[in-house]
């Protein structure tokens, strides 16, 4: 495999905002906790042939460091404290934390180390894998081609939305991890900023800084997964995670991800105190309409006006699906739509990679993500899945991947 000597990534901020938001919370609360995370390809792609090139890019990532301009930019945001930013300034990726191998054609990647350090690997590494694969398979693709496709999708959106009040539609770019390339994500988000008045932000800190957009993102599944071993009582782990997040961010970044266990298990823990303090909820698996109806009913049961809260939908969306959800809900609750792959790798003839990196251990003990979609369940240890299901009073067994 021919290697491109130049680095794909050129900024430490070329990552999802929630990684820095979680990293600060881990830095302040759980600095000595260790974790392990693993790569999964949910499709039938054999990516092992790219292992050497991926390893080369991982080595180059050790050169990334926060620049003075980036430090000043983060300092001007309301989220970060000086102790964390000074630590981040000295942070460097450590390639020894990542093992990459070609296992009979399958790509195996395992990341181990301190949570506060390894937390930053996932998003840029997935972006690197995606770009390497697409660059090798589809060298002919240009940013102009991607933007041309986006233009036609925006025209379609405008036609489909002509009969309703679309002024409350809000779009966020969530496209870093499975983008075709860094160049194409930049071109897509730039075009949206210029041509689509409903773009409210991007999850990518580098793009947010360069394009003067709001950075968006709160926490990921790993926040809740790690607390399965941090919390002394497993059944309390979700509440412990929700409270720890509020302790770190009392008045901001208040959107909670609901499907680490399941939506039903989440709502049992999401009492009036949490529901009042969190600004909203994020959907990432299962039927989105059913989920939204459950969220609205829960707020109403607690005596909270759903129009004072925000539902963020981010599971495999495109503009058409987002518009359908908007039609269903917009008069009853505030809405935001996070679209990723269908923005930054939506190119005729190109099949996006369905790849993830997920936590599998915390302090050498198993953790699990169950989710509201059976195919998204991740855990090494069937006995721990059973323990988790029992702790959260879950019925049906779902097969772990």
From Swiss-Prot:
Pathway: Cofactor biosynthesis; NAD(+) biosynthesis; nicotinate D-ribonucleotide from nicotinate: step 1/1. Disulfide bonds: none annotated. It comes from the Bacteria. Gene3D superfamilies: nicotinate phosphoribosyltransferase. Transiently phosphorylated on a His residue during the reaction cycle. Phosphorylation strongly increases the affinity for substrates and increases the rate of nicotinate D-ribonucleotide production. Dephosphorylation regenerates the low-affinity form of the enzyme, leading to product release. It catalyses: nicotinate + 5-phospho-alpha-D-ribose 1-diphosphate + ATP + H2O = nicotinate beta-D-ribonucleotide + ADP + phosphate + diphosphate. The keyword Lipid metabolism does not apply. CDD domains: PncB_like. One of its GO terms (molecular function) is nicotinate phosphoribosyltransferase activity. It is an enzyme of class 6 (ligase). GO terms for cellular component: cytosol. It holds the Pfam family NAPRTase. Belongs to the NAPRTase family. NCBIfam families: NAPRTase, PRK05321.1. This is Nicotinate phosphoribosyltransferase. It comes from Yersinia enterocolitica serotype O:8 / biotype 1B (strain NCTC 13174 / 8081). The lineage of its organism: Bacteria, Pseudomonadati, Pseudomonadota, Gammaproteobacteria, Enterobacterales. The gene is pncB.
